[in-house]
Amino acid sequence: MTEDKFVRRSLRTLSAGLEALGHEACPTTVAGWLRDLGYNLRVNVKRLTGPTHPDRDRQFRYLEEVIAEFRAAGLPILSVDTKKKELVGNFGNPGAVWVEEPYEVNAHDFLSAAQCRAAPYGLYDVLANKGHVVVGTSADTPAFAVDAVARWWVRCGCKRYRDAGELLILADSGGSNGCRPRLWKQRLQMLLADYYDLDVTVCHYPRGASKWNPVEHRLFSQVSRNWAGEPLRSPERMLSLLRGTRTQTGLTVTAEWTNQKYRRGEVVTDEQMAQLNIEHHDTCPQWNYTIKPRAPGWWHWN
């Protein structure tokens, strides 16, 4: 007898196996016996996150402090991340919707049948409870991420926070806006700090803690709920569903589309990194830093 604490066979198979051994029991009876023994049908539980970083709790406490400082000063706090890529075309979308007849969609999600593969980059304004999504059709690179932040600043941020000289960005520690990509920091220096004369502070969430990033549960969760069961048949339809996302707490969402191309693998040299005006914080410097404007003229970059 094994030490397994689970049963893989179906109730009918177990019933037939018992009958072969001379014990008659219908599938319903077998199910009752299993429950009496403490067995139930269960799905996998995603609970194990692996070893946590030793500075995880310290970083969360520091995040609370920095957010509180910016909130008290009325300075913009922007939570950012890329939502999962979506195939634009007549493809099924998880969820149900009230309709007279079900939507007929493609049986297979082949990229060749899609108009494009869209990468929605979400930007959530924590103080204003407003969301903005820049949908790109190229690679999800640090250049795309910073361009999206710059688009938000021009379209929303500079109007909502006219006298602000500082910006706090909350981001995951991985991905296009992670703490490692040099291009993310270089583009923030050139496109935001230098060009718009902003002190840009970035605080990253520790590995495995992306669900605590406000953009995930304040913006992306509402977007997913709004377009559940709705095929994203065209760019216009996708933008319409994004812009139609609202909540009773006042969340509204704006959205825009960009077909700009981004190259993967852009390299930032040590010399270029040395030219950045970046200050790493004393607390968890790998996750917290402020990029300040350089002398006038630096924004005339190639």
Predicted regions: what they are:
Residues G229-N302:
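C-terminal accessory extensions appended to soluble enzyme cores
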Residues E104-L170, G174-G175:
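Electropositive, glycine- and tryptophan-enriched low-complexity nucleic-acid-binding patches
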Residues M1-A25:
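A short, amphipathic alpha-helix used for macromolecular contacts
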Residues W184-V202:
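Two-metal-ion acidic nuclease core segments, chiefly of the RNase H-like superfamily
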Residues A171-W184, P206-W212:
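Acidic, metal-coordinating catalytic cores used for nucleic-acid/nucleotide bond scission
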Residues T13, T28-E104:
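Charge-mixed, compositionally biased segments that are often intrinsically disordered regulatory tracts
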Residues R8-R9, S79, E166-S173, V202-R207, ...:
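Extended hydrophobic secondary-structure segments that form protein cores and membrane-embedded regions
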Residues V202-S224:
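RNase H-like two-metal-ion nuclease catalytic core shared by retroviral integrases
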